[in-house]
Amino acid sequence: MVKSSVALLCKSTSTVKKRNITKTPEQYLKQISHLYLNSKNLDELGHEITLCQRLTVLYLYDNRLKSIPQYLNLSQLTHLYLQNNRISRIENLSSLGKLEKLFLSRNCINIIEGLEGLIRLQELRVDSQCLDPGESLVFDDRSLDSIANTLTYLDVSGNKLDSLQDLQNLHALISLNASNNSIQSINDLSISLNNWSNLKEFHIHGNPVMKTTRARDIIIVNARSLEVLDDKVISRSNRQFLENWNNYKGFNLELSGHPRVTCTKAFMCGHLH
């Protein structure tokens, strides 16, 4: 088992600011803002991390951590990188009130929870979790409600999701990556898109729903602020054409009350799930 130590922490700081030999290791650690503990084969992060009370950025990716370290009471931390570990649960984050970016990609998490204290969280990456057969990523309502006003970037790609309806209350979203999931219903997707009035970038490729006739056009009409869809810029003329067609031909994609996508023969929606 590889565990962190004061010596390892001192060796893992920025080359710009090396320790003054007149200072003890403990004194030095109290001054650092960035800590590079990535790719150290770490199984555990010890209590010595609490010495780093000015830490704003912590790199812990590409290790062997099975849980989020319990000593992360770092009140100044804004960026936490934990991707490529073996973490199975989101916990021990309640004291990180200034955290803005949380990277948890490629772990073993099946429930997105434990985010209640992250009142400034702007970016969350939980893509490509190692899930058991038949499982898909689950979202805790309380956690999502707590970040609904601040979260602008979310990556949930590669998690076997069959719907994005659990994410509808994340009304501050600007960028969402939901690619390579199992989303099938264009109706459900349209409902969600109508709730994300600020969404400018959306990735949905690699989902069965994109085999629906005119799927891209349906998405563009429902996501009125969208500028980029699957890495392709939506031109102003393209959007105007689709909106005019919708208004003139009666291709009714706008949802109100009990939502439903309808269309005329002219636009040929195909099979809507």
Pin down the residues of each PLM region.
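Long, contiguous C-terminal flanking segments immediately downstream of a protein's structured core
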Residues: 1-64, 70, 74-79, 86, ...
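Basic (Lys/Arg-enriched) interaction patch that binds polyanionic ligands
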Residues: 89, 111
